[in-house]
Amino acid sequence: RFNDLMQFLTEWPRQTAPIAVEVRHLEWFRPAQADRLNDWLRQLGVGRVLLDSRTMYDGQTHGLPDPQFTSERRKPNVPLQPVVTADFCLVRYISHPDLNFNETYVTKWVPRLQAWLAAGKTVYLFIHCPDEAQSPAIARYFYDTLKGAMPDLPSLPWDEIEPPAAQLSLF
């Protein structure tokens, strides 16, 4: 499979359409395979999706209910490998619906993101949750935590949107 992936990525028009790869099979996370993959991605300037699903599985060890109990498809339970292989990185943070449970994980992400941004990397941060109604609040919490460490970060675009006018009553 490695050769198939490398052939695909070699032929991909990376200069006009940057791409990142998310691997899920545990074989890709074994040290020899991970090093080989990361080296090749660096050579090509291809990003690696940094999937962080730890909250999905760690919460149960802290007595919290399984946030994926009603999910049709469970999130991959793979080791986090915070390796940047291109001039950008894509962090896919799968949050726990309990905002407070995310604090430890978010706090640990901040220095990494700071370092990558200081090194001139572009960081794409994709945050979602099995209970998608919680995703906006968790995304805001994550960004506010990062902004607390990096006050020069711009405001989130949705902070600039004027609230809609209140609808007048029809009766």
Where are each of the predicted segments found?
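Residues lining hydrophobic/aromatic ligand-binding pockets adjacent to catalytic sites
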Residues: R1-F171
